[in-house]
Amino acid sequence: MAAPAAAAVEEGMEPRALQYEQTLMYGRYTQDLGAFAKEEAARIRLGGPEPWRSPPSPRTPPELLEYGQSRCARCRMCSVRCHKFLVSRVGEDWIFLVLLGLLMALVSWAMDYAIAACLQAQQWMSRGLNTNLLLQYLAWVTYPVVLITFSAGFTQILAPQAVGSGIPEMKTILRGVVLKEYLTLKTFVAKVIGLTCALGSGMPLGKEGPFVHIASMCAALLSKFLSLFGGIYENESRNTEMLAAACAVGVGCCFAAPIGGVLFSIEVTSTFFAVRNYWRGFFAATFSAFIFRVLAVWNRDEETITALFKTRFRLDFPFDLQELPAFAVIGIASGFGGALFVYLNRKIVQVMRKQKTINRFLMRKRLLFPALVTLLISTLTFPPGFGQFMAGQLSQKETLVTLFDNRTWVRQGLVEELEPPSTSQAWSPPRANVFLTLVIFILMKFWMSALATTIPVPCGAFMPVFVIGAAFGRLVGESMAAWFPDGIHTDSSTYRIVPGGYAVVGAAALAGAVTHTVSTAVIVFELTGQIAHILPVMIAVILANAVAQSLQPSLYDSIIRIKKLPYLPELGWGRHQQYRVRVEDIMVRDVPHVALSCTFRDLRLALHRTKGRTLALVESPESMILLGSIERTQVVALLAAQLSPARRRQSKQKRRVAHTSPPSCQESPPSPETSVCFQVKAEDAQGEPHKPLKPALKRGCSNSVNLGESPTGHVESAGIALRSLFCGSPPPEAASESEKSESSEKRKSKRVRISLASDSDLEGEMSPEEILEWEEQQLDEPVNFSDCKIDPAPFQLVERTSLHKTHTIFSLLGVDHAYVTSIGRLIGIVTLKELRKAIEGSVTAQGVKVRPPLASFRDSATSSSDTETTEVHALWGPRSRHGLPREGSPSDSDDKCQ
């Protein structure tokens, strides 16, 4: 019993990985371990070996590699020496961050090159077929449909975890949640190729969110590679610090904005950030952005290192004081627009999930939904068609370049003569003006982007929202230029309106409203290369965040809820009632616990009562003094070891030795560990296996041999082994009749094959009734916790702790549950689910509304079934009866109330 318990300790210390479940759009994560439970139940029933019994293969220390004679050993020893030299001269962190920045810069530049080639190919096909409108439409529509379909299919086949942005998942990973196969090599390949095809199709999709995921995968893979040489990267906790730096690198190399990238990654992935990781993010992001722009110069895309969207606003007086109300209006309107975008995106997913018939049909045809969405958007953006009224022929980069133009498009309602006319004229079609084109562009791109981001391909939403905000700001700027055609007059001079500055303000405001970040202002400054409009940008971004945060969660928090990831909502601001809510108002008082002097029956009942990951260990049910906590896996291992088939066979063997005394057994009674049983099979003389009649298979003692006996001798122990092997054998009369029916020729042509009988074949020694009786006896024995690793100091709170302080502690420490004690006595428990639902339901129009104690640790249905033969099987049974814990996963009702 000590070995499984000790092994279960090691297993229990590892966090549970959330499984990814494919859905039509985003997918969801769940901690449902039904498959593992079924495998474990089958193993226990068959008496198979425990998976944790296999000893880990020891790794050769680096000091002993020089004694190896193979070529691989010498190469590895050389690499270890080079690694030690670099570490001693430079440092491990610097090497890691330089490699991470270099790899991400190369990946970003290569992807941008491939995306630009795909977009140019689409424009080339469209221009080449302009003489035939039907062929031009087919080419315009078919090209993105093929790319999106390939991206969706490739991602679903290789790694479904690569779907979507990646920032919501990284936010939960940095909090301590383990997502299965989310940072693997195949997910990296699927993300890179799928994102390249998705952005190359021309759909309104973004790159920033997926690049955070790509950078995190690079950091994880690089950590595994460097851990081969030893050092700090063998420590799993060290990887979290590098993942935080990788998130900054992902944004930095995407927009060549290292400062904004670091700040943005901190805002969207962390509630509390360790300042010791600050320099890592800045160094890696700066190096990555530098290499990214150097590669653009090397490829002759740029003449020198410059901003990604260079602007030329006047620096002496970029704006006047009288324009600040207009900038404030942009911020407030962007706040409402950002909240509406998040609501529309979540509503699309909810509507599709509620339509069960359509959802089931599209789930069977997984590529149909992305193809239909792409077909719809491509049809509406067809340049000779409706796309001419919304600048459909421009890509996102060309759209931003024209929107940030510092020249005025409209003066007194007339379109100015613009140079170059290739891109700017897209905003002034023959039968419309600039205002109508901008309004149609904003409205159409708004719902198109909300719909396109639900496609199951690697994609983000930052860049589409950024473009929509720039268009809205440009609309306000052009309106201001039309209202003040001669500019704004002051005492001494006149200042002309610059619509491009309004576009910069609108882009930062709407992006900040959707993501609930202020760092978008810094990203805009680095993208444009000018900081002239810092005051209007900051005013608009702060106002937009104030409005959006009071209406809707951020886009990333909304996706976290859609995907059923563990999360802890923010308390928000201005809710002073939450300071008066105490832990005693929201805690669960019926805490599942085990006493120090409990029996195995009490352990079984405690496991059936709760799905929690840990159980409280108290001194006695009367005193309820908290001694510590024990992992659920350890309790399961204790119960499984107590009711294991090996113990059952050992008990049966001892009982047989005590009640039966054959001569051979008296001299040397066999033990369960050393007894060897044989199984006899009949084969033809030619070597082909023979299939005798069914009664012949079940002859008890005629074909059994034992060590030290002749093949014809009869030994009682061998007979017992074969009777257990062939349980339910027919009467001896039926066996004798079947023997007489065999011909003598077949008997002569047979030979005997002797093989070892497995332990699982010996379970037939005891009938189901005897097994149940034996288990009832074992369940009444006391539990010995000396072989279990007990946490003597689990996290505890007092009942007077406020809800605000509890939220801060949970966010800062990353804990998922805390016991509530009073002078050492256990009186309740608060989990992540209770805290989340208390925060979401704590404020009403009348004041504080305290939710009743929630049911995450209440009794689950424990109806017994007559078909169960063992108590261990009942423990690991179907999840509807005694499911394994889904700690931290929101309930199904959360998805309905989004």
From Swiss-Prot:
Intramembrane-annotated stretches: 167-174, 242-254, 258-266, 500-514, 515-516, 517-528, 529-533
Biological process terms in GO annotation: acinar cell differentiation; cell differentiation involved in salivary gland development; phagocytosis, engulfment; regulation of aldosterone biosynthetic process; regulation of resting membrane potential; retina development in camera-type eye; stabilization of membrane potential
Mechanisms controlling activity: Common gate kinetics are down-regulated by intracellular ATP. Inhibited by AK-42, a derivative of meclofenamate. Inhibited by Cd(2+). Inhibited by Zn(2+) and PKC activation. Inhibited at acidic pH. CCLN2:HEPACAM channel conductance is up-regulated upon hypo-osmolarity.
Annotated GO MF terms: chloride channel regulator activity; voltage-gated chloride channel activity
Bias type Basic residues, positions: 647-658
Chain span(s) of sequence motif Selectivity filter part_2: 206-210
Residue ranges, compositional bias (Basic and acidic residues): 737-746
Annotated site location: Protopore gate: E208
Keyword vocabulary terms for this entry: CBS domain, Cell membrane, Cell projection, Chloride, Chloride channel, Ion channel, Ion transport, Membrane, Phosphoprotein, Postsynaptic cell membrane, Repeat, Synapse, Transmembrane, Transmembrane helix, Transport, Voltage-gated channel
Posttranslational modification: Phosphorylated. Activated by dephosphorylation.
InterPro entries: CBS_dom_sf (IPR046342), Cl-channel-2 (IPR002244), Cl-channel_core (IPR014743), Cl_channel_volt-gated (IPR050970), ClC (IPR001807)
Family: Belongs to the chloride channel (TC 2.A.49) family. ClC-2/CLCN2 subfamily.
Protein name: Chloride channel protein 2
Native source organism of the sequence: Oryctolagus cuniculus (Rabbit)
Gene this protein is translated from: CLCN2
